[in-house]
Amino acid sequence: MENRKATEAGQDVTMQKEDFAVLWKTIHLKVTDTYEVPPEILWVNGSTIGTLGNFSASTGKAKSKKTFNISAIVAAALKNDEVLKYSAYLPPNKRKILYVDTEQSKYHCHKVMERILRLAGLPTDKDRDDFVFIVLREQTPDKRKQIIGYMLENMPDVGLLIIDGIRDLMYDINSPSESTDLINLLMRWSSGYNLHIHTVLHLNKGDDNTRGHIGTELNNKAETVLQITKSTQDGNISEVKAMHIRDREFDPFAFRINDSALPEAVDGYVFKQPSQDRGFPLAELTEQQHRTALENGFGKQVIYGYENVLKTLKQGYASIGYKRGRNIHVDLNKFLVNKRMIVKEGKGYRYNSDFHY
């Protein structure tokens, strides 16, 4: 049995010379090579959130109006103009948009499609060649990936792929191997077909972390992760901010659903500043203070269990003179996770020394 496993493992890692020669041409980077800057296609208030050859994501809890926000992005891309706070420009040879929904019925998907066309100022009584909408609710995760892959292979002019429900392309959102494979697939699709992929994933109910191991992988690899949150001041308003972004961070904005059932910007909206405990200015601590506290608390360990993570934070930050109660350490944990100063590893959390403060 062990010999058979070893043989199978060997087959996975052994590569023929001819196969490697072909692969070498695609993986070898030389300083004399020249590469074009990836074309920018999506912006928010002047900040780039999407380029060809990359992928991004929208996250939010249930009822935060994630799909309304996605509708504005797609409408902007359809008209190559501005919708809500999103601006888009798809090159002439990349004008087609493929929208994949894995969650809703055809009735509800049809409402989304009509909403997008109305946002773009386009007629809803005429089909368009540059906007293809498919409903994969009834398919298995493997079949969904096969269908998307086949369509991309046979539709070379797709510039924007929307996947509303990335978790439905996998069986277990907490599987590290399945999550890695899916993110690698997104990267192959985006670079291989020179398009931008925008996905949708839920946030955990109890905190502001993206759901499952797939959420961790998204945060690590995505060009931009947008967070859509229902306003605590007005339940009819949703707030949009950058959870992670490679370009400069844009000012958050808010939108509501108007009488025509379309999202519209809420001008003059004042964002409520998150409350912080007096004497514990999370964002005002220096980078070195955070590093010292986390090194003293976590070291190189992976800490398992939420309460153990809080205990580790309490010990680490006490070592630099910050002794606070449990509620503050709950807020501190959220702050550190959002800043990727501590990251999920398997079912535990570890200190990430490679963070940017």
Predicted regions and their residues:
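TOPRIM fold recognition
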Residues: 1-9
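C-terminal regions of RecA-like/P-loop NTPase motor modules
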Residues: 3-4, 14-17, 154, 231-357
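The Walker A/P-loop phosphate-binding site
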Residues: 12-116, 354-355
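Conserved catalytic network of the ASCE P-loop NTPase/AAA+ motor domain
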Residues: 50, 89-92, 124-126, 153-155, ...
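Phosphate-binding/switch region of NTP-binding enzymes
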Residues: 55-63, 177-264
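Alpha-helical scaffold elements adjacent to nucleotide-binding pockets in ATP/GTP-utilizing enzyme cores
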Residues: 72-73, 108-116, 147-150, 181-185, ...
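Conserved, well-folded catalytic cores of nucleic-acid-processing
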Residues: 76-80, 116-119, 169-172, 189, ...
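Conserved inter-motif catalytic segment of the P-loop NTP-binding fold
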Residues: 91-174, 334
